[in-house]
Amino acid sequence: MKKWKKNNKIACSTMVLVMLMAGLSGCIGSDDSEETLRIAFSVKDDYASFDENPQKLADYLSDATGLNIELYPITSDSLALEALRFGSADMAFLDGGAAWMGWQSYGLEAMAADMKSDGRTYYSAHAWVLNDSAAGQAALDDDDATDPFAELAGEVSCHTGWLKSAGMLIPMGYFIGQGYADVVGDEDDIESLRNTIFSHFSEDASIPESGSLYYGYSGALRCLSEGEGAVAFAKDSTVDAYCAADDDERESWCLDRDRYVALPAFGQAPSHPLMYQPDTVDDSTRELIVSALLALDDTEDGQSILENILNTPGLIETNAEDHLGSYGGLIQHVPGIQGYLDEKYSSA
């Protein structure tokens, strides 16, 4: 009987020891302690080469940060935004509208932004007029008492399309926010913007459909050049892109380059920021990721990722206020913009 009790004690002690060792082993060698972050990214079924596969970006970030970075496949900005909102992903590159909505409505933040071809992370939105117009003369007379923007009331406006950033949302946000134009209709209905344009400018305002003659940046500038309108809303580089003085391939409808006058910029349209969820990405993790992204330009492989996967010459560190503040401060005045963006970026 005593022998049985002794053997039972040994067996129990052995079992406890095994359990303790197993638990200790789990604490020392378990992968559960390794932080996993997911970046929402549009993926395809196959790629011509691995250089185009976003998995290469995830692998690079994992190696550079020591974190486990995984892809979360999405097919649209709306799905990326929803993934960030509900915790399925921690980071995503978003367009300006989706990023601003995520910042304002869901508390997302920005850690980086991609550069455009000229190295900037934005482009400026302008009203372009002709130098012999009232607005053009007011812009060139060096007289602070004259207001070129006030001269545009009642003139036919040339927009790049319905609800385009530089061609409509930014300039109309400026005119409404600065008190030049009054909203006509329900302030919670995006369609009121159309009536506001017709009321402040002209019922003949050009708001073209995709594919029509005056659609896009070139279309808005052509609308101005051919006398169909008195002001074209476009970006800072539009005139030189199509009507540069020394360009042999300038468009046939272009006027002399010095005929075009840009009024002071309304504001900036942002490039794509890398937005993140502050609830899951702390400051130290953000710093690791930003450092890795900024270092992409230092190696040939990194430059390949920038060119073939991110489609940008480089990235900069930023935050939501710096990158989206100018844009959001303008478009918030557009009637119905919040509801429109809610619907546009709601998960399908």
Can you annotate each of these PLM segments?
Residues 71-82, 95-97, 183-222, 226:
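Short helix-initiation/N-cap motifs at beta->coil->alpha
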Residues 33-50, 67-73, 155-158:
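Short, well-ordered beta-strand elements
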Residues 1-33:
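Secretory targeting signatures
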Residues 57-65, 153, 165-213, 245-250:
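Ligand-binding cleft/hinge of the Venus flytrap
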Residues 93-107, 174-177, 217-257:
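A ligand-binding cleft/hinge motif common to bilobed small-molecule-binding domains
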Residues 34-37, 45-59, 281-348:
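An extracytoplasmic/periplasmic, membrane-proximal ligand-sensing/linker region
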Residues 38, 42-43, 112-126, 185-207, ...:
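Periplasmic-binding protein-like
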Residues 114-183:
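A conserved helix-loop-strand patch within extracytoplasmic ligand-binding domains
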